[in-house]
């Protein structure tokens, strides 16, 4: 689903629509989880909790845009919105195939949820039980939670951006551009001399987990990392007991991975003012831009890196 090619054109819009930011207990201001990533022609819905269908109406996005649903684990606040979303898509007459990814151990729960959906939909189920690629450009890695859980990472391949002025100076135009892209060299002119390196963009979701290697792998060089921040640092004991991240641990995860933008979410209902969590994450986030997600936010993917940081 991720694309990489040589192009003179800017990227299509890539945007995250935040549908909910609560953890297990919603509040008046925060619905349960839900994150819709609009990525070129794809719509990837992560962890739809209760009320996701209604939140999409408030956000002004159609369920028909969803092409893929990714569930990190089968606790209710991460998946109980699946039947409503599928039913709405069927009601709207969606004809395209919809792919549903989830941990293999959650098969009974997922099938029960799917059975509650009404209407006809071309739905394909994709359980996974180990780290690896589950679709083109989409990989999973195991997290450390109380039940089997996986985070997701969407990676666009690195590529090259053609520079029109350099093409013109080299006398290359029309069909010759395609030949140069295909062969890598044309009449002694290498592709590298008329183009610039373009790092692929990376997006990652790390939900319910204690700090672990899987979370670090997902976060590595992410342009946008959506990470749970259930507890403040002062509740580190609770975080360890329930296998969650504190705000500071989410910040440290971003720093270790060289993340550009860290979006905190999945907040405990005990917190009304989230600025404290942001500051705790910021203190350990290195150079990452730290933001607090709020319901119905729209977060644009950061502009491309000019170079890859190691």
Task: List the model feature ranges, each with a label.
Residues 139-218, 224-226:
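Active-site-proximal loop/helix segment associated with metal-binding centers of metalloenzymes
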Residues 46-49, 66-74, 103, 204-209, ...:
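Active-site neighborhood of phospho(di)ester-bond hydrolases with catalytic His/Asp-centered motifs
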Residues 81-89, 110-113, 272-281:
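Metal-dependent catalytic neighborhoods of phosphoester/phosphodiester hydrolases
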Residues 8-59, 65, 152-154, 195-206, ...:
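Conserved beta-strand hairpin/beta-sheet module of binuclear metal-dependent hydrolase folds
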Residues 50-101, 124-131:
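Active-site metal-binding motif and surrounding structural segment of the metallo-beta-lactamase
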Residues 130, 213-310:
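Binuclear metal-ion centers of metallo-dependent hydrolases, dominated by the metallo-beta-lactamase
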Residues 134-142, 154, 302-310:
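Short, surface-exposed amphipathic charged segments that create phosphate/polyanion-binding patches used
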């Amino acid at each position: 689903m991720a694309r990489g090619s040589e192009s003179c054109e800017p990227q299509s819009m890539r945007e995250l629509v935040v549908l909910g930011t609560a953890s297990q207990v919603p509040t008046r201001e925060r619905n349960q989880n839900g994150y819709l990533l609009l990525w070129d022609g794809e719509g990837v819905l992560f962890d739809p909790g209760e009320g996701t269908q209604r939140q999409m109406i408030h956000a002004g996005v159609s369920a028909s845009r969803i092409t893929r649903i990714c569930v990190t684990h089968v606790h209710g606040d991460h998946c109980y919105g699946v039947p409503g979303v599928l039913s709405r898509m069927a009601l709207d007459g969606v004809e395209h195939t919809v792919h549903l990814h989830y941990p293999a151990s959650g098969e009974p729960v997922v099938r029960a949820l799917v059975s509650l959906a009404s209407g006809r939909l071309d739905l394909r189920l994709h359980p996974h039980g180990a780290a690896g690629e589950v679709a083109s450009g989409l990989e999973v890695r195991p997290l450390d939670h109380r039940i089997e859980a996986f985070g997701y990472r969407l990676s666009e391949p690195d590529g090259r951006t053609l520079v029109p002025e350099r093409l013109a100076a080299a006398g290359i135009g029309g069909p010759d551009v395609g030949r140069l892209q295909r062969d890598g060299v044309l009449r002694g002119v290498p592709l590298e001399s008329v183009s610039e390196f373009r790092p692929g963009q990376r997006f990652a979701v790390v939900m319910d987990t204690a700090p672990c290697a899987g979370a670090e792998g997902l976060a590595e060089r992410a342009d946008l990392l959506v990470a749970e921040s259930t507890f403040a640092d002062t509740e580190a004991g609770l975080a360890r007991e329930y296998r969650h991240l504190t705000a500071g641990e989410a910040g440290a995860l971003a720093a270790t991975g060289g993340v550009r933008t860290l979006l905190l979410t999945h907040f405990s209902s005990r917190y009304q003012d989230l600025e404290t969590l942001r500051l705790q994450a910021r203190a350990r986030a290195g150079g990452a831009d730290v933001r607090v997600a709020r319901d119905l936010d729209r977060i644009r993917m950061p502009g491309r890196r000019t170079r890859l940081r190691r």
